[in-house]
UniProtKB/Swiss-Prot annotation:
Changing residue 155 to D: Less than 1% of wild-type collagen-binding activity. It comes from the Bacteria. Induction: Induced at 37 degrees Celsius by the temperature-dependent transcriptional activator LcrF (VirF). GO terms for molecular function: collagen binding. The chain crosses the membrane at residues 402-412, 416-427, 434-440, 444-455. The signal peptide, cleaved at the inner membrane, guides the autotransporter protein to the periplasmic space. Then, trimerization and insertion of the C-terminal translocator domain in the outer membrane forms a hydrophilic pore for the translocation of the passenger domain to the bacterial cell surface. Presents a lollipop-shaped form which consists of three domains: a C-terminal membrane-anchor domain, a coiled-coil stalk domain and an oval N-terminal head domain. The N-terminal half of the sequence reveals the presence of repeated motifs with the consensus sequence NSVAIGXXS. It comes from Yersinia enterocolitica. One of its GO terms (biological process) is protein secretion by the type V secretion system. Belongs to the autotransporter-2 (AT-2) (TC 1.B.40) family. Residues 403-455 are annotated as: Translocator domain. This is Adhesin YadA. The keyword Coiled coil applies. Residues 26-363 are annotated as: Surface exposed passenger domain.
């Protein structure tokens, strides 16, 4: 194909030079008396050109074609080869740089060593544009119809592929592929994605990774994650069990201590109140008894005196009878009075004792209710503390060196729940930092921070 193409170009050059009456060649760099390319039957069989014994001169063929540089060639209507060794082939083609080549109608090689091949293709300095309407910036390469390498040192391969001007050192490969950043390789665009197939596994840090490698790493990561999760769960359970036992022991000791204290206080209070009641009842009973006895003595003495006086007045015969009647009456009154006093004392003491016991029971119940409320609050705090601890233990440590992570976790114990958030940083393979805070509602907040060294 390359050999045939060269032969075709040579034939086209010979035909154009023989047939165009308007072809011309300027003086060599303004030096007079130097002849241009001559075309004659004695020309070289391969090119149809014959040079005199002078420096090489440019050649042109076609209507208004212009070859101005040394060794330059312009073929086609208005074709222009402006600098040394430049080649412009095709109507309206332009090659303005040294060693530049423009092949195709309206093609433009606008810088040194620029090469274009295709209708209306354009290449800047050191650029290569192949395909109709293909265009490049300096040192760019564009291959394919309407392909554009607008950034320096960029490559666009494929129909309508495009590297934007601000995406230097980027490559777009494939039909309508577009780049979106510097130093990138694109094989599609935002709504057209393609796959790289038959990709070998990467071996260096800068190599691409294929799906097989990725799956293997995912499985390895999952295995490590599961192992680490199991270890963390076991540690969390052990920590929770230890804390639960410790908190439960403290709560039980506190409860036992407070219960014993409450019972002792209630016993002392009840004993003191009962003692006071008994003392009051005893004092009242003694007072009533003394009053009754004094009244009975006064009454008996009065009756005795009256009876004695009457007996003395009415005769000695009646004295014994009157005295007996007086004694019976006195005994009856004394017995009745004593029974009344004892009954009154018993009722008073019974009522006072019942009241004391009732008040003591009410006081004891109130204290126990207060103790229950405190224990309930203590249980709630313990549950929230364990839930916060579980949430903090669920936070992950970053595994990659130089990586910072942000992690969140939840935890619960019985009816309490907590939310924990935290962050960690792995300084290197042996040193890592981590901190977190947990919230369990109201003002219940727990936090931790850790520093890890491995070897």
């Amino acid at each position: 194909m390359t050999k045939d193409f060269k032969i075709s170009v040579s034939a086209a050059l010979i035909s154009a030079l023989f047939s165009s009456p308007y072809a011309f060649a300027d003086d060599y760099d303004g030096i007079p008396n130097l002849t241009a390319v001559q075309i004659s039957p004695n020309a070289d069989p391969a090119l149809g050109l014959e040079y005199p014994v002078r420096p090489p001169v440019p050649g042109a063929g076609g209507l208004n074609a212009s070859a101005k540089g040394i060794h330059s060639i312009a073929i086609g209507a208005t074709a222009e080869a402006a600098k040394g060794a430049a080649v412009a082939v095709g109507a309206g083609s332009i090659a303005t740089g040294v060693n530049s080549v423009a092949i195709g109608p309206l093609s433009k090689a606008l810088g040194d060593s620029a090469v274009t091949y295709g209708a209306a293709s354009t290449a800047q300095k050191d650029g290569v544009a192949i395909g109709a309407r293909a265009s490049t910036s300096d040192t760019g390469v564009a291959v394919g119809f309407n392909s554009k390498a607008d950034a320096k040192n960029s490559v666009a391969i494929g129909h309508s592929s495009h590297v934007a001007a601000n995406h230097g050192y980027s490559i777009a490969i494939g039909d309508r592929s577009k780049t979106d950043r510097e130093n990138s390789v694109s094989i599609g665009h935002e709504s057209l994605n393609r796959q790289l197939t038959h990709l070998a596994a990467g071996t260096k840090d800068t190599d691409a990774v294929n799906v097989a490698q990725l799956k293997k790493e995912i499985e390895k990561t999952q295995e490590n994650t599961n192992k680490r999760s199991a270890e963390l769960l076991a540690n969390a359970n052990a920590y929770a069990d230890n804390k639960s036992s410790s908190v439960l022991g403290i709560a039980n000791n506190y409860t036992d201590s407070k219960s014993a204290e409450t019972l002792e206080n209630a016993r002392k209070e009840a004993f003191a109140q009962s003692k006071d009641v008994l003392n009051m009842a005893k004092a009242h009973s003694n007072s009533v008894a003394r009053t009754t006895l004094e009244t009975a003595e006064e009454h008996a003495n009065s009756v005795a005196r009256t009876t004695l006086e009457t007996a003395e007045e009415h005769a000695n015969k009646k004295s014994a009878e009157a005295l007996a009647s007086a004694n019976v009456y006195a005994d009856s009154k004394s017995s009745h009075t004593l029974k009344t006093a004892n009954s009154y004392t018993d009722v008073t003491v019974s009522n006072s004792t019942k009241k004391a016991i009732r008040e003591s029971n009410q006081y004891t119940d109130h204290k126990f209710r207060q103790l229950d409320n405190r224990l309930d609050k203590l249980d709630t705090r313990v549950d929230k503390g364990l839930a916060s601890s579980a949430a903090l233990n669920s936070l992950f440590q970053p595994y990659g060196v130089g990586k910072v992570n942000f992690t969140a976790g939840v935890g619960g114990y019985r009816s309490s729940q907590a939310l924990a958030i935290g962050s960690g940083y792995r300084v290197n393979e042996n040193v890592a930092l981590k901190a977190g805070v947990a919230y369990a509602g109201s003002s219940d907040v727990m936090y931790n921070a850790s520093f890890n060294i491995e070897w």
